[in-house]
Amino acid sequence: MLGAIHLGVLAACFVLFVPMAMAGWHLSRNKMLFFSGALFISLAVCVHLTPYFPSVSDIVASVSSVVVYDHRISCINEVNQIVWDVKPVPNPESVRRNNGSTKLDYFVKNWDWMKSRKVLSCEFQKLDKFDVSDLLNGSWVVVAGDSQARFVALSLLNLVLGSDSKAMDSVRGDLFRRHSDYSIVVKEIGMKLDFVWAPYEKDLDDLVVSYKKMKKYPDVVIMGTGLWHMLHVNNASDFGFRLRQLSSHVESLVPLTPKEQEGGGSVSGRSVHLFWIGMPVLINGMLNTDEKKEKMSDTVWHEYDRSLGESKILRQMGGPLILLDIQSFTWNCGPQCTLDGMHYDSAVYDAAVHVMLNALLIESHQSL
Ligand SMILES: *[C@@H]1O[C@H](CO)[C@@H](O)[C@H](O)[C@H]1NC(C)=O
Ligand SMILES: *[C@@H]1O[C@H](CO)[C@@H](O)[C@H](O)[C@H]1NC(C)=O
Ligand SMILES: *[C@@H]1O[C@H](CO)[C@@H](O)[C@H](O)[C@H]1NC(C)=O
């Protein structure tokens, strides 16, 4: 049994050094004080309960790990909480003079995370090129799905390569070849990005199975479908059935064991970080064919949305994929942000990418 003095010294060390170690993870001073206080109280409780438990160190370890991780993990539920500020450009004349401008160019679109207390406490931030290079260094990223997924891939590459870089010019051309796959290696950071044209859920399913066969898994998979199925199959219960199949394949095929990182550390949980690109709001009157207007009605959209929820593929329903809530982004950006009622301004997909990266930071237990 430890003496009272030993215990006191141990407690003092914890209160002092644990928050200092955390400060190394870029916690603000207020947070540090908060953690010091929380630890102090936890330790005081521990000391009083010690006689009832076999070992002080077990309790201390469990208390500190709970304090550290609980806070950020719950932030996954808040990461999609963003608000939009869309207003007319101050100088429409200059837009008009610029050739090839569309309606989208007449609106300035800004977005940020909601300023509620809970969301603020999560300290989400838009990542710059260097943050992303750091985070995705050496990673294999796969974006798979329909045209929405393609726009997400474009936004991610914009961020990694820089939107005015020469490289981006050729990316834009190659990525938008109709209905085809695309692959690029960003040498500077050893990141590989694959875009896989996979307009149906079955295509996504096949992709997951193929990784299993190769025994080689990407680090990040961002996928999303729905619109093709809605237009060409138009059967929400079939959509739900396909999603359940995809979900169960993801659950059974993608390994859960900790995986060694390049840096030497290991990450617990699923070794692949998985995201689902939600369906955009469809503005029926703006859809560009009669077939679309008829098949992609609000009623059908809601049936598809319900099937997505019931498929339990999303984390919020207990499934494996974290939602990038395109529905909320497109609804809040509004009709000013789309030309065809289906594909939206790049600002929407940029937001989705920043949401994904913030979730990835939390999931991989990293901070900037
Ligand atoms: C717009 O197009 C016209 C003729 O096509 C050209 O003379 C002019 O330089 C272009 N302006 C800009 C800003 O690109
Ligand atoms: C990427 O990681 C490698 C190896 O860990 C390191 O040498 C390199 O500087 C990193 N590059 C960037 C851009 O962070
Ligand atoms: C819709 O899909 C379900 C499940 O695949 C199937 O049982 C049903 O017959 C389909 N409905 C129609 C109208 O095709």
UniProtKB/Swiss-Prot annotation:
User: Could you name the Gene Ontology cellular component terms for this entry?
Assistant: Golgi apparatus; Golgi lumen; Golgi membrane
Query: Which UniProt keywords are present, listed alphabetically?
Result: Glycoprotein, Golgi apparatus, Membrane, Transmembrane, Transmembrane helix
List the GO biological process terms: xylan biosynthetic process
Q: What is its main location?
A: Golgi
Cytoplasmic topological domain residue ranges: 1-32
Residues with glycosylation annotation? N99, N137, N235
State the phenotype upon gene disruption. Severe growth defects and collapsed xylem. Decreased xyloglucan acetylation and decreased O-acetylation of xylan.
Which superkingdom is the protein from? Eukaryota
Report the transmembrane regions from the record. Answer: 33-53
**Would the keyword Transmembrane helix be found if you checked this record's keyword annotation?**
yes
Task: List residues in topological domain: Lumenal.
Answer: 54-368
Where in or outside the cell it occurs: the entry states: Golgi apparatus membrane
Q: Which GO terms describe its molecular function?
A: acetyltransferase activity; xylan O-acetyltransferase activity
Query: Which membrane topology term applies here?
Result: Single-pass membrane protein
Q: What does this protein do?
A: Component of the plant cell wall polysaccharide acetylation pathway. Does not directly catalyze O-acetylation of xyloglucan but exhibits weak acetylesterase activity in vitro.
Q: Kindly provide the name given to this protein in its UniProt entry.
A: Protein ALTERED XYLOGLUCAN 9
Q: Which organism is it from?
A: Arabidopsis thaliana (Mouse-ear cress)
